[in-house]
């Protein structure tokens, strides 16, 4: 989702004002507005008719001792939950990346690079992308927390035995110690993600390192 959102957002910003940009913007807004559980239900209806497994983590009867067949089966069960969450978050990344690149492309040094005759690819790669990554780094760090909220819905739709499903079941059973543990894990994950984001900031923006 991150790679796709960055690439599509970059293209949309470079071709801003065109039909391609309008199509990308509509696609991003549409996918961003979709609830993750609704996306999961749509995938079940489209891909679940004998093509891919629609629930659980593994086909009943398979064990880790079965070797490669077990892990292939787990991968097949993971396809639809992964796609459901990736589609929704891709739209958000497209909008953030598009906005960041459009802001950078209006800077004077981009106009100077164009005046020097640099190619479009080099301008985007060497000048625009790095500076437009700062808002993306923040959003990626915040997504770690949001992902658990989306995972609760997706794991419930697909009956996937993960952290989100554990939180959902704990709420239903009023199992407060388990809820406290999952909330603590979530908080630690968000703190670590924000710490990594601050470190990446210093790498991408030397002014942060100087401060």
Region locations from a protein language model:
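Conserved active-site segment immediately N-terminal to the catalytic lysine
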Residues: 23
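Membrane-water interface segments at the C-terminal ends of transmembrane alpha-helices
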Residues: 26-56, 77, 84-90
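Alpha-helical transmembrane segments of integral membrane proteins
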Residues: 1-20, 36, 61-211
């Amino acid at each position: 989702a991150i790679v796709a959102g960055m690439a599509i957002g970059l293209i949309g910003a470079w071709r801003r004002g065109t039909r391609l940009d309008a199509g990308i913007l509509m696609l991003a807004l549409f996918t961003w507005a979709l609830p993750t559980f609704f996306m999961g239900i749509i995938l079940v209806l489209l891909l679940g008719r004998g093509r891919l497994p629609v629930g659980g983590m593994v086909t009943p009867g398979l064990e880790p001792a079965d070797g490669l067949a077990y892990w292939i089966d787990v991968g097949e069960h993971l396809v639809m939950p992964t796609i459901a969450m990736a589609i929704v978050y891709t739209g958000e990344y497209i909008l953030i990346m598009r906005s960041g690149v459009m802001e950078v492309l209006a800077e004077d040094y981009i106009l100077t690079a164009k005046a020097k005759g640099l190619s479009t690819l080099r301008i985007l790669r060497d000048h625009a992308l790095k500076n437009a990554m700062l808002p993306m780094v923040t959003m990626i760090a915040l997504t770690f927390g949001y992902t658990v909220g989306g995972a609760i819905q997706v794991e419930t739709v697909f009956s996937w035995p993960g952290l989100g499903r554990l939180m959902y079941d704990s709420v239903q059973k009023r199992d407060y110690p388990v809820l406290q543990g999952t909330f603590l894990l979530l908080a630690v994950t968000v703190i670590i993600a924000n710490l990594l984001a601050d470190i990446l900031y210093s790498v991408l923006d030397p002014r942060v390192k100087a401060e």
